Amino acid sequence: HIHAQLVYRDASNFPLLGRATESAGARYERFPDSLKNISRAPLWNLSRNSAGMAIRFRSNSTTIAAKWVALFNTHMNHMTDTGAKGLDLYCLQKNGDWRFVNSARPKGKTNQVTIIKNMHPEEREYMLYLPLYDGLVSLSIGVDSLATISQPLVDYPIRKNPVVFYGTSILQGGCASRPGMAHTNIISRRLNRECINLGFSGNAFLDLEVAKVIAEVEASVFVLDFVPNA
């Protein structure tokens, strides 16, 4: 039995959902570089977590894999490593619902995981959620060498006028067992609308810098849930 080799494509080739600003210096960070020396240090460090972000792509591969390098290699005794620094793959169903496929469970800072294999080779729309309590140095998506991986053809979640959430560790995704189970990500799938997660663990202190980032977004709804920290 011949196994097709996997070919990895840099995830920066595909749409990134869940970022408030296009001026972030690093692709998987939530603040623009201009705030680096202005923000409080804990807030800046948390802004480098990729909470609420997801990659959208389309593929007919029988296998989907991922390679990624975590920014901080976060490990906490009250949250799973998969929730903190793992990935979560979902597939769009014909009825418009998103179905959980599997998680990419991290082993450490540098990871390579086959998320699913032995699928029928048909075109599917995918969404890959990024870590909630860590950032990414790099991310690439692996598919069969003879398969295609391309831009999504379906505008789900709808990106026009996203919902912007601001809040605490609860909102950032603590302590979801895997990235897709942060409540902003659940809401995004239920509404089929892009949600932007500006949750900052222990740091929802109504910083002016955050207000400036929020103000950049042509949002449909602003959800402000900072009271547990205030």
Predicted regions and their residues:
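Conserved SGNH/GDSL esterase-like catalytic core that processes O-acyl groups on lipids
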Residues: 82, 110-113, 118-125, 131-140, ...
